[in-house]
Amino acid sequence: MRYLAIDLGAKRTGLAAGDDVVRLVQPVEVIDVPRGPALAEALARAVERHGPDALVIGLPLNMDGSEGAAAAEVRAFGATIAARTGLAVHFHDERLSSFEADQRMARTGRTHREKKQLRDALAACAILEAYLAETG
């Protein structure tokens, strides 16, 4: 099954693609659109471009593992995307995914601007890699 992972942000949303056969995950793009109807449309177009079978959306849990207001907002947005695309949406813990993305970029020699742009897509990679590892 092919997945498109989504790391939702207030200003930018990172996307990563991968599958559960070879378990290769790669960053594919960053969408520079604030969350809302315009982002839902941009994600629907990204789904058409990348052709996933399902979506994995990072769920912002509290550090104790509980769900707060941010998680409820992401779940509601996920329901919108599911209705718009007709794809199954899976949610996965995104705690520390941005930290992991920063660690991956720490020694790459990229400029601050390049790192800032790539960070969200690498966070989506971390979310999808963890999801695939957990689901078998």
Give the label of every model feature segment.
Residues 2-6, 10-136:
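Phosphate- and other anionic-substrate recognition elements at nucleic-acid/protein interfaces
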